[in-house]
Structure formats: C-alpha cells, structure tokens
C-alpha cells in the first residue's frame, strides 16, 4: 500500500515539473542557443562570433565597434 502511494506521489511531482515549463519557452531557448539574440546584453550567442543583435537577427560588428548600440 505504501509503495502505491509513493508511486502516485512521485508521478504527480514529475508531472507538475514537466507542466511547469511551457513548450514554447523551451523552443525559444533552443533557438537562442543556436546563435540568436541574447536580450539581456544585446549580444548574440558567443558561438556566433562578435556580432550585435539588430531586432531578432545578428549583425557583424565592424573593427572599430566594441559595444552594441541601441
């Protein structure tokens, strides 16, 4: 009896953790990790090189630019 109750409680906890993360938010994170814009600092992902974000796209920095404007 205790094993059944424990199994039900564990199943409920796992389901609540899965339901807490919306599918659209997880998809957005995977797109950002592939080189999209990082809104907190306006730079693109480090893997995409020295680029700034312009809207939702990454643009190349010139040799003289060291920060992202705007």
UniProtKB/Swiss-Prot annotation:
Residue positions assigned to the propeptide: 21-34
Location of the protein in the cell: Secreted
Tissue: Expressed by the venom gland.
GO cellular component, one term: extracellular region
Coiled coil: none
Protein family: Belongs to the neurotoxin 01 (U2-agtx) family.
The protein's name: U2-agatoxin-Ao1p
Position of the signal peptide: 1-20
Primary localization: secreted
Disulfide bond sites: 37-53, 44-58, 52-68
Job of this protein: Insect active toxin causing rapid but reversible paralysis in crickets. No activity shown in mammals. Does not show effect on mammalian voltage-gated calcium channels.
One Gene Ontology term of the molecular function aspect: toxin activity
